[in-house]
Amino acid sequence: MSLPLTKKDLMIVNMGPQHPSMHGVLRLIVTLDGEDVIDCEPILGYLHRGMEKIAENRTIIQYLPYVTRWDYLATMFTEAITVNAPEFLENIQIPQRASYIRVIMLELSRIASHLLWLGPFMADLGAQTPFFYIFRERELIYDLFEAATGMRMMHNYFRIGGVAADLPYGWIDKCLDFCDYFLRGVVEYQQLITQNPIFLERVEGVGFISGEEAVNWGLSGPMLRASGIQWDLRKVDPYESYNQFDWKVQWQKEGDSLARYLVRVGEMSESIKIIQQAIEKIPGGPYENLEVRRFKKEKNSEWNDFEYKFLGKKPSPNFELSRQELYVRVEAPKGELGIYLVGDDSLFPWRWKIRPPGFINLQILPQLVKKMKLADIMTILGSIDIIMGEVDR
């Protein structure tokens, strides 16, 4: 007796917004035919806080504590772009020592961000062992941050014209010790992960993006460099003092999840090289120049004058943003983080447009997961590396 064939019904599954592998409050509406993904629709906005509108009602210094809540795992970069925008707009020069300190902090933050990507990414694939080794090294970076800035996260360390405080005594030696130790840690990760046959089965050939597709979708960072495009803003559009260091852009041509993993692991080693060179070359001198500039404006001010000590020092240094516009960008761990700033001869920005790398990189997700298996969604989403704080803003 033959049973009549019935048409299979498609299944619609909600993944998130409270799924442990969603890396934040991301919701995916997935249409399945058995285990095969037919369609995927990301739903964003659960973490929208109006960051661009808040900026239009604050001075830059007042706004600085807010920006660490975009990408809260790489806060040095959000601070850097926030102070770079008015510095470029008003042509404010920063001391060489402050620029070197910024580079050191940015590269430490890049390593911490990549580590915090790698640990959960491996856990998503079912590999729990590397997670604990990775967080061991990340803890050392946070100890360095705490010693220099007073905070493990949300540092609020960068200032217009420099940084908030100089490096404490003995900090540079501890940082060099960490660099030597961490290079051995990267080798350990590669031995544990890179040649693991189960890991390779899960990531090799999964989530392929060609170089042309990557450019057309506006991807940046490791997503772009893993598809054969050697584009790193630290090389092609140098900022701070990156043009004074010798390092190589990490890239792969395969364009799959494995290539994105290899790019990020390679970047951690290159970041250590940059930090070591910056520490070796770091000059003496002031760590910020804004107080000196404000002091010189007052003809009759004295260093021990009442007005300078109590009225000039305590409030935020305010200055008007001239009627100009510019776009400034940095190479964040997840890609190109940019700010489009429009001044209006007032203390507040007239327009503060954020270009978050995670939001733009996430747009290609539905195309990548179609015709893949349900289990591959976590691999592909993890390889993109998103933080919903900067995606939703």
Swiss-Prot record:
The keyword Metal-binding does not apply. It is found in: Plastid, Chloroplast thylakoid membrane. It catalyses: a plastoquinone + NADH + (n+1) H(+)(in) = a plastoquinol + NAD(+) + n H(+)(out); a plastoquinone + NADPH + (n+1) H(+)(in) = a plastoquinol + NADP(+) + n H(+)(out). The gene is ndhH. Keywords: Chloroplast, Membrane, NAD, NADP, Plastid, Plastoquinone, Quinone, Thylakoid, Translocase, Transport. The lineage of its organism: Eukaryota, Viridiplantae, Streptophyta, Embryophyta, Tracheophyta. This is NAD(P)H-quinone oxidoreductase subunit H, chloroplastic. PROSITE patterns: COMPLEX1_49K (PS00535). Its EC number is 7.1.1.-. Belongs to the complex I 49 kDa subunit family. NDH shuttles electrons from NAD(P)H:plastoquinone, via FMN and iron-sulfur (Fe-S) centers, to quinones in the photosynthetic chain and possibly in a chloroplast respiratory chain. The immediate electron acceptor for the enzyme in this species is believed to be plastoquinone. Couples the redox reaction to proton translocation, and thus conserves the redox energy in a proton gradient. It is an enzyme of class 7 (translocase). It is a peripheral membrane protein. NDH is composed of at least 16 different subunits, 5 of which are encoded in the nucleus.
